């Protein structure tokens, strides 16, 4: 219960108007352990006791109030002042002054001969808010005063009823036990599990509290269970509850307090990984359809290994490797994946370069820090190293001073090398080694399909829940020695749920379409440069359209008006989706030295059954490889469908499609 406090001034003129009822009052005052009351002091004691007696049997807003009244002498002038500490279920800042003045003036009306009224001055802060710390005010100020400074005191608060007029107790050097203010009315304390005995502790014992405190605790736990940490999320989850709380000033304050406690509990008392896991495991069974899994497979990473590392990293169990760095060109899914993970945690912050003086203004008190398009300047390199390494540090905040930042996981996305430290117009690699020791780098090199869309929290929860349910043996073998570059995919260790394209070993099965391996190998490259390969206006079909089986539509021949989809256009989330990137040995293909051609994997080297003729991946890799070799010898012959018959060379030079197809990209960059 909130206890308000204030002061009533009683001048000497009021006592001059005392009538016979006041002077001749027969009210019994127990002064056995108190200084004797004489003259006007006795009048004030009678007046205070009369007010307390009337308050005990009154109704209206003052019904059931807790009160503590103490009258004292003025120091510098004649007269008295009364300290009033009062609170009840019907009292609030709006009616406090009216109720207190009405109570005291109603009693005073029958004790004076003239119409005299007292004015109540409530205790208020500099911002105009009422003090609600009556309990602390009694304990730390009023009860420490002794006679003769105190004339009289009355109260109905358990623990102070007998001690408030005990001079021996007040003169004690310290109290044996802090009295506790009963915060319930009638049977409320027993319902809430509190004891109403004298001398109990202020802090509830064994986690028990009042109905209001238990309700507030339940609200905080509900926010954490439903992953509600912002007002906007609260409105979406339970708009009715939010509206009811927002209808009053105290309810609005309760909303802010509950959200702060829920965020603190989620960031400090509960592992962050619990918010990244799905509660219903049945919804994570079809993991091969997960967008994040497809994205990681596209980027040549094992989704299981990456997911298990993310779970360790988000719980700050990776030691100094406190940072994930997604590095690569634009449109490869870096920021998409980073923001999906960030939106799944309770609360995340971002490094903001709009104000270079306070880039880490939004880092304190967060579960995760997102550093998009990161760049490190010499002025903040030491603070950056501490944050990236998960070490506690202090950062400056705008108009707030410095604030402590504990170890917080960091995810970085960038197109450039963040290990370069920028100082003015110069860059240095002095800190590169120290920065790399704090990061795990994932290279995103393959452009994503425009059909991918944004990754959602459900995708993250499905992916990480599946990873958490699998064996951690593969991850533990790598985690023994953390490396700067995250290890690429290992076909032998890939989980069976992720192997969507099994390798064909039966030599009796021919390639699709009834074509021979030689015809399919020869035509695969020409499908890459077919006139319709760059036609982006025609919608793609889920059914593959057969390409040309020979080079009839190649450069120099007439162009067919029929739009023919290339084989690489049908690829979705595979390394072959970026056909115009030069192949990397050991990443995109393995060289078969015996037969002198590239194959898709080690198992197809020197394959007696002719792996190239049976595996479609080997055919695509061979066509891709031969295409780059062809471009080296004929760099100016290949044109896109729009410029096959173009006579103006500038039209070809400015066409990005022609540049990719003909190998003119290096020439254009040079010029």
Swiss-Prot record:
Keywords: ATP-binding, Covalent protein-DNA linkage, DNA replication, DNA-binding, Endonuclease, Helicase, Host G2/M cell cycle arrest by virus, Host nucleus, Host-virus interaction, Hydrolase, Magnesium, Manganese, Metal-binding, Modulation of host cell apoptosis by virus, Modulation of host cell cycle by virus, Multifunctional enzyme, Nuclease, Nucleotide-binding, Transcription, Transcription regulation, Viral DNA replication. Its main location: host cell. One of its GO terms (biological process) is symbiont-mediated perturbation of host transcription. Residues 533-548 have a biased composition (Polar residues). Residues 1-186 form the PV NS1-Nuc domain. One of its GO terms (cellular component) is host cell nucleus. Optimum pH is 7.0-7.5. Residues 1-176 are annotated as: Endonuclease. One of its GO terms (molecular function) is helicase activity. Changing residue 177 to C: Complete loss of nuclear localization. Complete loss of NS1-mediated nuclear translocation of host E2F4 and E2F5, although still up-regulating their expression. It holds the Pfam family Parvo_NS1. A divalent metal cation binds at residues 72, 81, 83. The keyword Cell membrane does not apply. Homooligomer; when bound to DNA. Interacts with host E2F4 and E2F5; these interactions promote the nuclear import of E2F4 and E2F5 and the G2/M block observed in host cells. Interacts with host transcription factor SP1; this interaction is important for NS1 transcriptional regulation of p21/WAF1. Interacts with host transcription factor SP3. This is Initiator protein NS1. It comes from Human parvovirus B19 (strain HV) (HPV B19). The lineage of its organism: Viruses, Monodnaviria, Shotokuvirae, Cossaviricota, Quintoviricetes.
